[in-house]
Amino acid sequence: MSKGIVVIITGTLSLLFSSLMEGYSQDGSGHSARIMFYNVENLFDIFDDTTTDDDEFLPDGIRRWNYTRYSRKINSLYKTILAAGEWSPPAIVAFCEIENRKVLEDLVHGTNLSKYNYSIIHQDSPDPRGIDVCMIYRKNMIDIISFRYLLPPVTGDNPDATRSVLYSRCLFSGDTIHLFVNHWPSRRGGALAGECIRMQIAGMIRVKIDSITSVMNSKARIIIMGDFNATPEDQEIKLITEDYDSGMSMINLSESLAGGTGTYRYRGTWEIIDQVIVSDGLLNCRSGVYSHPGMLRIFKPDFLLKKDPLYPGLSPFSTWTGYRYQGGFSDHLPVILELLVR
């Protein structure tokens, strides 16, 4: 083969690769957008909030939480978000275990994320510890039509024993995305712990989806993401994915993730409790914004993992092991969903 032909082929492949990368990059051209969810494991500031139980995250508290540790945590999260975007940070980053708006402002405005024009959606939840669900979004890529925080009609002795669900209508490339961000009650004390409230939240979301589809039939683009403290096999998740009267289907994309993987590791076993559920309207649309199961992944670069000291294999490099500080990122791994446009 002559040198001239090699040059032509190499140049053609280079142009093809560049065009493909452009189509999947977040350069503001509207070709794609990444949505990330991340349980950030207790992102507290170092100041006392007299309205919540945050005493352990004070400089004189049991965790000795101080400015140095807080700054390291902020910079670790910035590093993770930037790496998750590859070409540029995700269009939307949804969080849970955030104490207040101030820590989000420190993350968005106090790091190099300030270059990416992020805006904040946050509201204090009724959680006794004061940890909230919230999100940041890039204003040059996403418009927020509206948002509200939803609470189920919780029954029982403790009506404040849950977090709000953040529901927002987001406009991307001319299409409306209905986005729900969740952090359901923990299974601490066993899998059945908190199940009643988790079922109530699932029922509330199902009612909201019925309301959306009553207006848009089965064409609505819906994304439900978060830390559900339940696996794809649990009944509270199945309640969301059961058949709807409108004929629309909700598909749990997390079920398609490879076996042996997960977002959280408990006693040496990976679990997928941070999940993404989407409507078939997002998967099957013939034009506009869409996604498909292969576009969901668990973000697990080497720096987010460490050797598990008790069990074979790797675990998330967490900030804490019990009450012992180890300076890592989070005890959960983030999940990322890619949205494309056709």
Predicted segments with their positions:
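Structured beta-strand-rich core segments of catalytic domains in phosphoester-bond hydrolases
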Residues: I98-P185
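Second-shell loop/turn segments in exported
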Residues: G61-T68, P89-F95, H122-Q123, V154-T155, ...
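Catalytic metal-binding/acid-base residues of hydrolase active sites
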Residues: E41, I98-E99, P185, F228-T231, ...
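Bacterial Sec-dependent N-terminal signal peptides
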Residues: M1-G30
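Active-site His/acidic residue clusters
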Residues: T51-D54, D175, F180-G194
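N-terminal, active-site-proximal structural segment of metallo-dependent hydrolase catalytic domains
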Residues: G23-N117, I121-V133, L304-G313, F317, ...
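Metal-dependent phosphoester-hydrolase catalytic domains
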Residues: Q26-D27, I209-I222, A230-R342
